[in-house]
């Protein structure tokens, strides 16, 4: 099948606000079909403050009003099915936005349920919990507002990492995936999936620059066990729906990659 990625803001604009929208993609489905496209992959269109092109999600159950409404999304899925086409969305579950309700609740009660949805560490005499450098540069640690703690973010500081070691967090992720698949979504392209497994317990590495920090890649090289998370996610979500899945993978060890792309029953995702 032939796939086409669609950055919605750069797609057809139906209301003249200068931003592409979901109704615009609906209008162009026939054209895409003529091109031989079977799968339309949408870049993030969830509600988001857009600190990182929509990869900072503040509500996994809503469409950002810049791009349309949930009714528009339902119509897009339905119209695509009429043409024997599938809609695939980006799934961003290594992190969320710092404007997500989970994170807001974590700030209010860092020792409570939602504090455990993230990687929080106490501040100790001005020393960082680890010397890891984020993909965006600088430390992966940022002060948790109103507390004496810091939170982990391997990407932008407005993208706190979700704690996949917490079963309650994983349940919320699976619940959301199934909610979308029940709507008729064809599947997901899962963003930065290799990052959901951290090397624990967290510790420092030899600095590789004068800033005293070390590339986050060093931690990923040491992390192991992502196959357990991916297998659970597959069995709880994609497999029952016979849904499409593809993962963005980088800096993975060969043995970890083998768990992701080899044939059933051990294949967790396609890459």
Model-derived segments and spans:
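Single conserved hydrophobic/aromatic residue that forms the stacking wall/gate
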Residues: 1-10, 260-271
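Catalytic cores of alpha/beta
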Residues: 256
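Acidic/aromatic-lined carbohydrate-recognition and catalytic surfaces
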Residues: 2-5, 9-178, 182, 195-253
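Hydrophobic residues within beta-strands of alpha/beta enzymes
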Residues: 40, 188-190
């Amino acid at each position: 099948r032939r796939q086409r990625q669609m950055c919605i803001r750069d797609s057809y604009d139906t209301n003249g606000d200068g931003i592409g929208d979901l109704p615009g993609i609906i209008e162009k489905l026939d054209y895409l079909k003529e091109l031989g496209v079977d799968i339309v992959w949408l870049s993030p269109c969830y509600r988001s403050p857009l600190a990182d092109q929509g990869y900072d999600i503040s509500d996994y159950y809503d469409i950002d009003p810049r791009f349309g409404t949930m009714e528009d999304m339902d119509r897009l899925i339905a119209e695509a099915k009429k043409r024997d086409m599938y809609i695939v969305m980006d799934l961003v579950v290594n992190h969320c936005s710092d404007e997500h309700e989970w994170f807001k609740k974590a700030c209010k009660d860092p020792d409570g349920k939602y504090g455990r949805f993230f990687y929080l560490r106490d501040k100790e005499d001005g020393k960082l919990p680890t010397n890891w450098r984020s993909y965006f540069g600088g430390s992966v640690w940022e002060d948790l507002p109103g507390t004496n703690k810091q939170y982990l973010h391997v990407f932008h500081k407005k993208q706190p990492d979700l704690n996949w070691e917490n079963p309650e967090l994983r349940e919320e992720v699976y619940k959301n995936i199934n909610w979308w698949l029940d709507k008729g979504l064809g599947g997901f392209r899962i963003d930065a999936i290799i990052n959901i497994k951290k090397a624990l317990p967290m510790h420092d590495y030899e600095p590789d620059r004068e800033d005293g920090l070390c590339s986050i890649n060093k931690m990923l090289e040491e992390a192991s066990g992502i196959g357990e998370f991916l297998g659970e996610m597959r069995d709880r979500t994609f497999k029952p729906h016979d849904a499409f899945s593809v993962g963005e993978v980088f800096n993975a060890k060969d043995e970890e990659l083998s768990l992701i792309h080899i044939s059933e029953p051990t294949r967790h995702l396609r890459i």
